Amino acid sequence: AIRLYPPHQPDLIQRPLFEAHSHIYASPEYLDEYGTPSSLTDLDQHRIVILGTDTRPPVPDLNWLETAGRETGKRRPAMSLNNIFAIRNVVEEGAGIAAIPDYMVEDRERLIRVLPDIEGPSFQAFFVYPEELRSTQRVNVFRDFLLEKVRASQF
């Protein structure tokens, strides 16, 4: 399995695959209509899209944009969705600004990185498998394949 959280089960082998980063993205149409923020505090005047709090986030700290640059409290989101792909899609269509993992936007030409000097939290992805499969050829071949693909990608 590929997990975006480290497993807590002691009988599982975990191999770090990559460290992923997230940044702030918006569409050109959104930026044309609402302007480009020049600081984190400017985000208070923008339409922030977040993952709903009743949803288990697929990646850690996905909603960091709610509090980034604020001394107290959270920004009120313009939209709260229950799926990270839906967040990417509505931002791509001009609905707002969101923190999105970079690996989800690398092939998306309609998303522009906003506040490029601001780094969101990073997180590790792990290849995880049961101890008893450690020496099986198919797991080793798949692991090697994953590592080769990871080296060729940017996260």
Tell me the role of every PLM-derived stretch.
Residues 1-5:
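Pocket-flanking alpha-helical
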Residues 7-125, 152-155:
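C-terminal regulatory
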Residues 117-155:
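A late-sequence structural motif
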